[in-house]
């Protein structure tokens, strides 16, 4: 299941470097408004890619029995639902990649990105997995759900940081034009 999900993540991996290149090209030209425009374009592409990958993951989840004919029904069932949960957060995962590896670091916001990843992973994802799996007895569903929760929280935090941060305006003291 993870292999199939990772294929879609790799397919979107070029968006973050594209964000860095296009934003810094605009910054080099001295235009913060152009940098913001490039960031918004990359975000639209990331949203579209995430939605497309969601649809493709849902399709892939139905192909599991054909791809893995010698696997038991219980494993196929868990894998099917795991892929559906992964598909539901695919847009958030792609946006997290673009925000965390492209847009926010372009605004010299790397420390925030690292802190957000640490907090989301170790203060949200891991405790949620422990709670869902051990305390509530959800097993694999708890792991899938805690990963989804972590990705959604990161996407919200990164979006809010992008939307309301002054980091891009502070870049090299560039005036808005």
Model-derived features: positions:
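Short, flexible coil/linker segments at or flanking structured domains
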Residues: 3, 11, 52-53, 63, ...
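Short runs within selected transmembrane alpha-helices of multi-pass transporters and secretion channels
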Residues: 13-16, 86-106, 112-124, 128, ...
């Amino acid at each position: 299941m993870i292999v199939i999900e990772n294929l879609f993540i790799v397919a979107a991996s070029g968006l973050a470097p594209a964000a860095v290149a296009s934003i810094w090209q605009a910054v080099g030209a001295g235009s913060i408004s152009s940098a913001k425009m490039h960031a918004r374009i990359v975000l639209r592409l990331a949203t579209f890619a995430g939605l497309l990958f969601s649809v493709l993951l849902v399709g892939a989840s139905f192909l599991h029995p054909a791809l893995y004919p010698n696997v038991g029904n219980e494993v196929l069932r868990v894998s099917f639902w795991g892929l559906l949960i992964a598909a539901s957060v695919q847009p958030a995962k792609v946006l997290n990649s673009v925000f965390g590896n492209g847009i926010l670091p372009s605004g010299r916001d790397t420390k925030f990105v690292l802190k957000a990843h640490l907090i989301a992973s170790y203060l949200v994802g891991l405790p949620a997995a422990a709670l869902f799996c051990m305390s509530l007895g959800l097993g694999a569903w708890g792991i899938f759900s805690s990963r989804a929760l972590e990705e959604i929280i990161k996407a919200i935090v990164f979006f809010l940081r992008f939307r309301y941060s002054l980091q891009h305006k502070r870049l090299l003291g560039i005036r808005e034009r």
